[in-house]
Amino acid sequence: FIAPTDFGVGLTSISLGLVRTLERAGLKVGFFKPIAQPHPGDTGPERSTELVARTHGIKPPVPLSLAHVERMLGDGQLDELLEEIIRLYQQACIGNDVVVVEGMVPTRHASYAARVNLHLAKSLDAEVILVSAPENEVLSELSGRVELQAQLFGGPRDPKVLGVILNKVRTEESMA
């Protein structure tokens, strides 16, 4: 389960890279983005799912629409939503050694993303890799932000938390 620590960390880029790396290691890889998060103006298929399908020939399940997910959450139907997602995940697992699951990205309109990601990871009994990108912050600030997100999934020492991928890293001087 690939979980972002914040908006703009390059989650889809990391997911694509992870799929490619696992394929190169000889594994049969599936991909699953449970919840579509369209960008403003998007009218076609969900971007992550379409990118993986086109670049790797994988046929992931169609993600649930954000409107559908928000309606279910608003109606207190979290358990039913998770069951629906688990059914789709099971489709993604067919014939694969491993499935890369891309979590929700927090936005102004989806501030609940971290909570949903936690429920998804637990329901799928998934191992978690956090993805972060340093903004204009020193390493201690970045470390604190990553550790805070790791706590959501049981803490950095939890065996389900595999680690963190830092994306968009600049030179050492800019991180000092």
Predicted regions and their residues:
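Conserved beta-strand elements of the Class I
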Residues: F1, G30, E127-I129
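N-terminal phosphate/diphosphate-binding loop that engages ATP/GTP or pyrophosphate donors
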Residues: A3-A92, R108-A110
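Structural recognition of the conserved hydrophobic beta-strand(s) that form the central parallel beta-sheet
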Residues: F32, V98-G103
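A short, structure-level motif marking secondary-structure boundaries and short turns
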Residues: I2-T5, V101-G103
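Glycine-rich phosphate/diphosphate-binding loops that line cofactor/substrate pockets in enzymes
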Residues: Y89-G95, R157-D158
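Conserved catalytic-core segment of NTP-binding enzymes
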Residues: M104-A176
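Loop/turn-to-beta-strand initiation segments
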Residues: G95-V100, E127
